[in-house]
């Protein structure tokens, strides 16, 4: 009898494939969208900068004027002790949070809300930023890092600047163990062994005197879970 495939183990939800969110510092999102932000602004002070396991960017603990504390994504150039502003009348400065409708065209932004008050959903990885392209009646167009232009509500908030931690890809891992530990913080199993490199008991493509599939790579959508590898329910395969 063969062994379970990686996809079967992942679906079972074993600890190896569960994201260790209990190690995170907490929810990283904007404060509630209250009248203080809608009518003016509120000041906050960066009291600490923290490393959040599994996140590619550092987070800052910010204490606001009403003694509320939040974890926020910080831009490049922010340090402990600096003040940030949140609200419709905030200054256009890195780290400040404003509605998209109040941010001029061409300004880099990140941690963009898709619905006003959702806390920020888009452009949150280290070194990423989007651009405000244009404003129109009831909508703002933002160009995302992928090149896709998204139409958003002008009341959606965003942070001015570029997410910190942009140089992380310039330093190589050097050792395989370091990469393993880095990806395990996100529940990504690494290294990934090819099916043809396995034994026959471990994978449908395993075994043989040399590495080859030995069978068609197309399988039915209704085939058994232990055989569902390759091109699943493919209409066609190969180059056009």
Curated annotation (Swiss-Prot):
Ribosomal protein recorded as keyword: yes
GO biological process: cytoplasmic translation
InterPro entries: NA-bd_OB-fold, Rib_uL2_dom2, Ribosomal_uL2, Ribosomal_uL2_arc_euk, Ribosomal_uL2_C, Ribosomal_uL2_CS, Ribosomal_uL2_dom3, Ribosomal_uL2_RNA-bd_dom
Claim: Kinase is one of the keywords in the record: no
Top-level taxon: Archaea
Keyword vocabulary terms for this entry: Ribonucleoprotein, Ribosomal protein, RNA-binding, rRNA-binding
NCBIfam families cross-referenced by the UniProt entry: PRK09612.1
HAMAP family: Ribosomal_uL2_A (MF_01320_A)
Family: Belongs to the universal ribosomal protein uL2 family.
Protein name as catalogued: Large ribosomal subunit protein uL2
Species classification: Archaea, Methanobacteriati, Methanobacteriota, Methanomada group, Methanococci
Gene name tied to this protein: rpl2
């Amino acid at each position: 009898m063969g062994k379970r495939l990686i996809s079967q183990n992942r679906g079972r939800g074993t600890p190896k494939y569960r994201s260790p969110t209990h190690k995170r510092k907490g929810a990283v999102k904007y404060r509630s969208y209250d009248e203080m932000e809608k009518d003016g602004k509120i000041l906050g002070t960066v009291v600490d900068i923290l490393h959040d396991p599994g996140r590619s960017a550092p987070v800052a603990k910010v204490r606001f004027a009403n003694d509320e504390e939040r974890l926020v994504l910080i831009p490049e150039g922010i340090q402990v002790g600096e003040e940030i502003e949140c609200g419709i009348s905030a200054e256009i400065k890195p780290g400040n949070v404003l509605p998209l409708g109040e941010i001029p065209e061409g300004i880099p932004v990140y941690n963009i809300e898709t619905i006003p008050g959702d806390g920020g959903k888009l452009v949150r990885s280290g070194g990423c930023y989007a651009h405000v392209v244009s404003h129109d009646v009831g909508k703002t167009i933002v160009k995302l890092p992928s090149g896709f232009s998204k139409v958003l509500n002008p009341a959606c908030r965003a942070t001015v600047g570029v997410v910190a931690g942009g140089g992380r890809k310039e330093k190589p891992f050097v050792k395989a163990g370091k990469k393993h530990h880095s990806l395990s913080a996100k529940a990504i199993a690494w290294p990934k062994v090819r099916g043809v490199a396995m034994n026959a008991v471990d994978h449908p493509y395993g075994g043989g005197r040399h590495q080859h599939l030995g069978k068609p790579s197309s399988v039915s959508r209704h085939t058994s879970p232990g055989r569902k590898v390759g091109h699943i329910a493919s209409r066609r395969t190969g180059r056009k």
